């Protein structure tokens, strides 16, 4: 049976909106994915029936909110394939998760210890480590990127040494769509005792994960990219590692006991969840992950791969256009960046907006990668399972119109 | 909205790229970056007796940014520093606050009228002017 994209689209109310009198062809999913009605209903129902502060309230609403929040933690654990929900720390998103690690894990590092990043990282997986370098004198090393927009894993042996403490890489590039061969990274990390953190912002939206099988130590992702609300995300860490880390933010809830002289801290995950957390957002993100877990990802992936191929062929048919990333479907997702010489990405996006097509243009918070390809920016189309042939065709038609009008 | 934005005169202005390049030293220079998109404009110029004697721009930007840089390249040489400051301020007000563009400003600026409705693109037009003002700070640090 073929993938029923029409019934999937019907679950996303925004896709039937007509802003400016045109249908929406939403291909900016790598920035923010749309959210299904079930998630909107869950958040609305929670706020209407179960709103209260969590953990310390001795009343029915507080208990209901606490239960919903803790159940959400369990749903995140299931989505990531991990058995222990206490290994899930709710965060404000991927950036907040990496900053948490840069402080907490960073506090365990010494002057001269090394962290390996890559040239294709999002700024959120670069700047927090640069700030740590300024605070504590750690050394950053860099994996290069191949002409195809993939991590050059052949360089791992050169970049990893006895002082390497952490390897922090994108699971999937938000520019090139290339998926990292995590097995090779983990294999290279283990002999020197380095930990591996994956920025899963772009991979997490494309189906449930099995983190124990991946063999990594930390994983971060964002709720708004997995069809859930803004302002929420999660950090997963192996229990033994999270337990060994000091807290990052101080405040209510993250303590065991507070006294004038010193304070002691709560067990994981609460140690890392200071203050009142975004409760409804956590509940909403869990609803989004349950929605995702109910999807047939084998069919959904076949569908998005077919659309990706259609998009790649369409872009390649436009004279002079260059794909920044893998040209084929192997080891990539439907995040497709391209350069059209003489046309600026923002002008392209503006023209495409006139066709009802939502794209993203610019450096995508990856200026080091842009330098690698000698570009100021690219135009990016990114695909979700609810996209269809009409979205891709509108995009290609719009790109041809942009060439006609701007070149 | 988009149909209006990239009209023929504006595209032609951007492609004309008047005075693209670099003024040979000795020159004043100013640079402006848009961190949202990575666009960058560098203005180099010479000033004599309170007027811009020579000016050139290196522009890595979108069509709106290129067109604004070309307008500067076409009209700023020969203009007084005071006039340039005034035009930049009036352009900013016209784009962002809906004021009128007074008679006597550079005629090319009226071609940016459709941009007023697209807030996210105002800074594309203003970036070359920011670089120009930056360059002039060396002689007029207002």
Per-range role (PLM):
Chain B
Residues 28, 41, 57, 69, ...:
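Short capping/connector residues at structural and topological boundaries
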Residues 16-59:
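Structured beta-strand/loop patches that form or line metal/cofactor-binding pockets in enzymes
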Residues 1-21, 79-142:
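C-terminal binding/interaction regions
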Residues 37, 62, 124:
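Functionally engaged cysteine thiol sites
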Residues 59-66:
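Short, thiol/selenol-centered motifs that function as redox-active sites or metal-ligating centers
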Residues 68-80:
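Alpha-helical support elements that line or immediately flank enzyme active sites
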